[in-house]
Amino acid sequence: MFPSKVKSAQSLSFSFTKFDPNQEDLIFQGHATSTNNVLQVTKLDSAGNPVSSSAGRVLYSAPLRLWEDSAVLTSFDTIINFEISTPYTSRIADGLAFFIAPPDSVISYHGGFLGLFPNANTLNNSSTSENQTTTKAASSNVVAVEFDTYLNPDYGDPNYIHIGIDVNSIRSKVTAKWDWQNGKIATAHISYNSVSKRLSVTSYYAGSKPATLSYDIELHTVLPEWVRVGLSASTGQDKERNTVHSWSFTSSLWTNVAKKENENKYITRGVL
């Protein structure tokens, strides 16, 4: 039997079906821009072609309350329509990610780090590493879902283009094969259930079989109470366009009423 739950007013919801050039409720970091009603998360040259060694991030400006205590937890759903494309016949790199991080999170390295992590093995909460686009220390306090287009064996990547779930490190906890299609719009549906503690990912192209992935994690044990959600992407020596066409997000902060009632009964009996 599931515990009773009450929805809190402390929820976050937004939906972008297009992106204006001066989108005030978004924070742009690194090379990310908004142009022609889409997000270009990594840099393009004057001809609209991707460039090497680029990193960009876009965060929603309003912080999200992820948890209050062990009895007040947030569930969320986000849907991203995005396109990874290249005009070149060479390999592409490096990928795009949805991430959750502290509100003061800043961009990190390009290439295989996807603008998210200061180094491949970081498991602590901070680093003194610096990126070319910032002088502030980048934090590894990040949970991310990556769509990784470049295989980095040194980072523990499988030998195929994949979706991965990352927790405080670019080394994914779990991965699933992802059949990337050049220039086609992919849909990613990412959700977190605060009751089952499961982070789930489904991604698909129109008319194709979806790729699915999940990982059980208690987000309140690895992330602070207040966070921001964002999108991040990078290129290395090889390159790609990382284009976001739309993005929606909704969250619900739930209170575990049954647990609180039991705690109150215990306290009452103690007083008597």
Swiss-Prot record:
Biotechnology: Preserves hematopoietic progenitors in suspension culture by preventing their proliferation and differentiation even in the presence of a cytokine known for its strong induction of proliferation and differentiation. FRIL's ability to preserve quiescent primitive cells in a reversible manner may significantly expand the time and range of ex vivo manipulations of human stem cells for clinical applications.
Gene3D superfamilies according to UniProt: 2.60.120.200
Top-level lineage group: Eukaryota
Compartment(s): Protein storage vacuole lumen
Binding site for alpha-D-mannopyranose: D94, G112, N152, Q237, D238
Cellular compartments per GO CC: protein storage vacuole lumen
Keywords assigned by UniProt, alphabetized: Glycoprotein, Lectin, Signal, Vacuole
Coiled coil: none
First and last residue of the signal peptide: 1-8
Glycosylated residues, chain numbering: N125, N131
Alphabetical list of CDD domains matching this protein: lectin_legume_LecRK_Arcelin_ConA (cd06899)
Modification after translation (UniProt): Glycosylated at Asn-125 by either a paucimannose type N-glycan (alpha-4) or a single N-acetylglucosamine (alpha-3). Glycosylated at Asn-131 by a paucimannose type N-glycan (alpha-2, alpha-3 and alpha-4). In alpha-2, Asn-125 is deamidated to an Asp, possibly due to the action of intrinsic peptide N-glycosidase (PGNase).
Record-linked InterPro entries: ConA-like_dom_sf, L-lectin, Lectin_LegA_CS, Lectin_legB_Mn/Ca_BS, Legume_lectin_dom, Leguminous_Lectin
Pfam families: Lectin_legB
Note: Four different alpha subunits (alpha-1, alpha-2, alpha-3 and alpha-4) are observed and their different polypeptide masses might be due to differential C-terminal processing of the corresponding polypeptide or to differential N-glycosylation of subunits. Alpha-1 lacks the 8 amino acids N-terminal sequence present in the other alpha subunits. Alpha-2 and Alpha-4 differ in their glycosylation pattern. Alpha-3 et Alpha-4 are N-glycosylated at their N-terminus. The Asn N-terminus of alpha-2 is deamidated into Asp.
Quaternary structure note: Dimer (alpha/beta)2. Tetramer (alpha/beta)4.
Annotated function: Mannose-binding lectin. Accommodates most effectively a non-reducing terminal alpha-d-mannosyl unit. Strongly precipitates murine IgM but not IgG.
Family note: Belongs to the leguminous lectin family.
Protein name: Flt3 receptor-interacting lectin
